[in-house]
A protein has these predicted regions:
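Small-residue (G/A/S/T)-rich helix-start motifs and N-terminal tracts that mark the onset
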Residues: 1-121, 130-137, 150-282
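Non-cysteine beta-strand/loop elements that form the S-adenosyl-L-methionine
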Residues: 138-146
């Protein structure tokens, strides 16, 4: 189904930033569970956790090996490394897609059973993209063109990364229809779609093309999904709005950090709070 394109703005993004009241506490402000990072990509665990924490979630629960937990705690000592109730899940950043290639292989993952037991809104990134359409809860996936080409081809829709890059608006809608999930297709112009909504983000700063920026986006998105979890469960399209807002915030944080110069993922994270403050003042 072809949708009308909605161009996302700062005003739209600000609506997805939940500000706490005097009655809030860390649990009511949203708890994000993360299953991210690996021995091959330990930085993903650090970056997703730090980005989520900087975006204003009430608590981050990190689930992985003790070695990765020590790395995470060195950068984000406020992270909790014990399992417990969460409002949203972020799964897959920095995890090998070849090792966990489908639902059956994910069933062998130590922590995946918690994702199934706590059926809350879930973000699937990188190594968890193969789970798209397999979970009962509201789900958003965050592929780039190559990952989406692999995912769609595995589902019988043969397409190349080059074809997706040539017409991302078409293929993000195709993916949403084929997979039955909300899709955030990363690129110089990012698109978000479900089977009703199509959102176009402003062109991103080229400095955002740096290692770890996808992990930062995943962390921002995880925090926003956790803080908007009730709204997402009550409004089908809210997950798409939150996904678009995460991409908007990431780009604005990158612009602020860069000021026309090169940046890294850590600099983007450091700029998130000031970026949120500016959006909330609009």
């Amino acid at each position: 189904m072809t949708r009308t394109v909605k161009k996302w703005s700062a005003r739209d993004a600000a609506k997805c930033i939940i500000t706490p009241s005097d009655l809030d506490h860390k649990y009511s402000r949203g708890v994000l569970g993360l299953i991210t990072g690996s021995a091959q990509f330990p930085g993903a665990a650090v970056l997703t956790t730090a980005a989520a924490s900087a975006t204003g979630v009430g608590m981050v629960r990190f689930h992985s090996s003790s070695g990765l937990a020590h790395l995470v705690l060195h950068t984000t000592p406020s992270a909790v490394v014990q399992p417990g109730k969460v409002a949203a899940w972020l799964v897959g950043s920095g995890i090998d897609a070849k090792k966990y290639s489908d639902f059956t292989t994910w069933l062998r993952h130590r922590w995946f059973k918690l994702v199934r037991l706590q059926s809350v809104p879930t973000i699937l990134d990188a190594g968890a993209l193969s789970l798209a359409g397999s979970l009962e809860q509201p789900t958003v996936i965050t592929p780039h063109s190559g990952e989406l080409a692999t995912l769609l081809s595995a589902r019988g829709v043969k397409v190349s990364a080059e074809a997706i890059e040539g017409d991302p608006k078409k293929w993000v809608q195709n993916a949403a229809d084929t997979l039955g999930v909300t899709v955030l297709l990363k690129g110089s112009t990012t698109y978000v779609a479900n089977d009703e909504v199509l959102i176009q983000l402003p062109v991103a700063t080229p400095w955002l093309a740096t290692a770890g920026s996808g992990d930062v986006l995943a962390g921002i998105l995880g925090a926003l999904v956790a803080t908007n979890a009730i709204e997402i469960l009550n409004d089908y399209n809210q997950l798409a709005y939150v996904a678009a807002s995460a991409a908007f915030i990431q780009n604005q944080a990158a612009v602020r950090a860069s000021d026309g110069a090169p940046i890294n993922a850590e600099a983007i994270i450091a700029s998130i709070p000031a970026t949120l403050a500016k959006l909330l003042k609009r």
